[in-house]
Amino acid sequence: MGQEQAGEPSSAGSRLFTSYRAKETDNYVKKLEELGFIILGRSSTPEFGFKNISDAQIHGPVNLPNDVTRNAGGSSGGAAALVSSGISPLAPASDGGGSIRIPASFNGLIGLKPTRGRIPVGPSSFRGWQGASVQFALTKTVRDTIRLLYHMQTCQMESPFILPKLSKVSLEEAVRPLKIAFLTVSPIGGNVSESAIAATKKAARALESLGHHVHEISNQPLNGIEAMQSYYIMNSVETAAMFDSIEAGLGRKMTLEDMELMTWAIFQSGQKIPAKIYSKILAQWDQYSHQMAKFHESYDILLTPTVAEVAPKHGQFALSENLQNHLKHMADFDWPKQQELIWEMFVDSLDWTPFTQQANLTGQPSISLPVYRDEQGLSLGVQLTAAKGREDLLLHLAQQMEECSVFS
């Protein structure tokens, strides 16, 4: 999503847009075309990218290629399945809360979420989810990730988020020994599987053997529950704004029949959130960015699991009948109650993937690397997060780990 090509389908996983053809080509896709890439087609996502699995009703679930009883993840699940199954060596993807890194972890791929402002945006949208959503790709090799980042990066003056470009030298020169903090505790207090912990400790040992200074920490840099509550408020308001534009374009009001139930609930909740609350949570994101900048004065890198569990079974996050009934009547509740229901709607899937969203709020670069497979052959990645603008550190570490056969 956010990667439209003029004249080509762009449904965003929604029944509203099954016959829609993009009217213009996004700057991201223009850059790919300039670099000589051949665009094969579109891949599947959940409706409007709201989930960490890909199961849009108009397309059906996306299977994990090495276990078709499981989901490939989301929201860039179709892209991940394409690369993992060998159809393409890389696939464009977007990440608004882990949508590159989560399927990368499940599919044994490399998934980089670049710093906010690194990759071309517009002209249809310059501030996706207030900067939380960014574009990049899923790959199989660090070399491809480095080359793609170097050639795709931009200093885009019309964008609200602007970065100086990374030099070729900075992406190729040897890295000094880094200070790396690692933790395996969920930022929202949920369960983290033994496999996810084992993956993280394997990566920590490997990085230490490469000469880096690795320290286990117990305290989360940010308040994870508060951060996710702010994320859902943003998601709700941005969805309400999106449907306001859709209603204007179609000349009618939206109904539940136009969308999936989860989308309906998010849409309804966004219509009641006061503007002052939205302003406060965006200011809160700035404070999170400040807190992480202070954290990186002590540590160059934060290492965590990418996800808490291996890829989920199809239907694992099905909503209870009671919750579905509440969501159908979402408009009847005040906004605090609506947000409680949004939390309840997402909590099972959030427990599965609680580590990725914070980098979207702060704008930091973060990468998932494929370091572990469990006894069933299911992949789990680890996540490395650096200070804003320091993709070079992430990619140097990734390259070192790849060259030392840490990847699995």
PLM region spans:
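Short, well-ordered beta-strand elements within core beta-sheets of diverse protein domains
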Residues: 16-20, 133-140, 269-270, 384-385
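Acyltransferase
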Residues: 194-218, 247-252, 278-299
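Gly/Ser-rich catalytic/binding loops embedded in alpha/beta enzyme cores
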Residues: 1-96, 205
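Alpha-helix-centered segments that form part of catalytic cores
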Residues: 340-366
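Short, well-ordered beta-strand elements
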Residues: 137, 378-387, 394-395
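A short helix-breaking turn/cap at a secondary-structure junction
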Residues: 113-203, 406-408
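Short helix-loop capping/hinge segments that flank enzyme active sites or metal/cofactor-binding pockets
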Residues: 1-15, 174-179, 237-293, 306-309, ...
